[in-house]
Amino acid sequence: MLYTAEILTIGNELLTGRTVNTNASYIASRLTLMGFSVRRITAIRDELEEIASVIKEILGRSPAIVVVSGGLGPTYDDMTAEGIAKGLDRKLVMNEDALRELREKYQTRGLPLTQERLKMALLPEGAKPIRNEAGIAPGFTLNVNGTDIVATPGVPREMESVLESFLNHMLTRRPPVYYYEESFLVRGVMESTLAPHIKGIVKETGVYIKTHPKGHETSEPYLEVQIAYSGENPDRVKEIVRSVKERVKAVVRELGGTLDRVQNP
């Protein structure tokens, strides 16, 4: 069974170029390795109506999971929880479990729970907090008509902590889907020459094959060929990838190319 996923990253700094969106790359990689097919990555500003609108739009496509990153902190422009609540037409409520976590973290440091700090415990009605082991603001999750919404902080180490906690929990709830890929390097065959052969193999097998140019198309053709597949049986997935890999390598040889530094023998 194919599980689809979407990623929503929130923050003005992502749209101005001040911050490189490394969170999206990390999340996409982790979801892919878990067998999800990531269909879209969206980046938007810290705007309440925009967050609400995009959440509605994403849910209309019914992905298995949407991971949201950013906007869970104590400042005026941290409005992800409120935006998600608005998009779901739910109330924003004080979550007792999130409040307990915040109280514990601030009291340990001898600090009071100000209104700004209490704000981080306001979650959409029905949401379950995810403990943030790397920082303060808790993440949260809720399921809407079969779609898991997972909200994580924007600070990379905190996003990773919250996301990994959720994914580890998810493994106990859903049958695993395995992702596997291998790649090898090709010299002496232009991408445009190899393209029709790749297209035919993809159409026949359903396996993902991608060529990544590393040299000049005509004067110095040099390609990385990536082959990837997902499925519920890990041994079968590897077998399919390796079988297709051998077919592509045979085509490369027929076209007069050479194989260089196989990365995943």
Curated annotation (Swiss-Prot):
Transmembrane segments: none annotated. SUPFAM superfamilies: Molybdenum cofactor biosynthesis proteins. Coiled coil: none annotated. CDD domains: cinA (cd00885). InterPro entries: CinA, CinA_Arc, MoaB/Mog-like_dom_sf, MoaB/Mog_dom. Belongs to the CinA family. This is Protein Msed_2121. It comes from Metallosphaera sedula (strain ATCC 51363 / DSM 5348 / JCM 9185 / NBRC 15509 / TH2).
